[in-house]
Amino acid sequence: MRVRKRKGAEEHLANHPQYVILEPEAAKGKWHQIFGNDNPIHIEVGSGKGAFITGMAQQNPDINYIGIDIQLSVLSYALDKVLASGVENVKLLRVDGSALTNYFEDGEVDMMYLNFSDPWPKSRHEKRRLTYKTFLDTYKQILPKNGEIHLKTDNRGFFEYSLTSFSQYGMILNKVWLDLHASDYEGNVMTEYERKFSEKGQAIYRVEAQFKD
């Protein structure tokens, strides 16, 4: 999600260290200590303006959520949502999703979400796609054995690519939705993009993929 540069975004984030992790490398291996409990840790890579991560935190107060986005202004808007919601089980992290092993120990994350990731449709950009095999190597390392990735997208090409990538990696596709909003799936929390696309009648694709031992 690309947004205009927001004036004061960096200061806004710095003023809320209870939600924004300002020294992410120092958090590695200490996430339960940071949250102050032993609840499961779920991360969203590419959290955008925070609608999903905040909504999930409200629905599931016994789960710790970490929203990850590299864009300063975007993360500052996510912070607005966290503050307005009053949830206490969310942290925000401004880092690149390709370097997650710098911020999480092996198996420290219980679940991860990829929502409306940039599809990078050109073949020469394949390695930038968040479901490319080198990213899967990273995810597998920080997730537990049999850890899961839940993915949503409006882009059919990226969805099909991701299904193939997961399968070729040896992952199990537990559940697949070709039109999420027309299904009987309950508990869906929409992202900003998802709401926009669904209002136009566009199909939303979803998959729950699981690593094997």
From Swiss-Prot:
Pfam hit, one: Methyltransf_4
Name of the protein in question: tRNA (guanine-N(7)-)-methyltransferase
Function per UniProt: Catalyzes the formation of N(7)-methylguanine at position 46 (m7G46) in tRNA.
Enzyme Commission (EC) number: 2.1.1.33
Pathway listed: tRNA modification; N(7)-methylguanine-tRNA biosynthesis
Binding site for S-adenosyl-L-methionine: E44, D69, D96, D118
Enzyme class: transferase
Active-site residues, record numbering mapped to chain: D118
Key words, A-Z: Methyltransferase, S-adenosyl-L-methionine, Transferase, tRNA processing
Organism: Streptococcus thermophilus (strain ATCC BAA-250 / LMG 18311)
Lineage per the UniProt record: Bacteria, Bacillati, Bacillota, Bacilli, Lactobacillales
GO CC field: tRNA methyltransferase complex
Amino-acid positions noted as binding substrate in the UniProt annotation, renumbered to this chain: K122, D154, T191, E192, Y193, E194
Similarity annotation: Belongs to the class I-like SAM-binding methyltransferase superfamily. TrmB family.
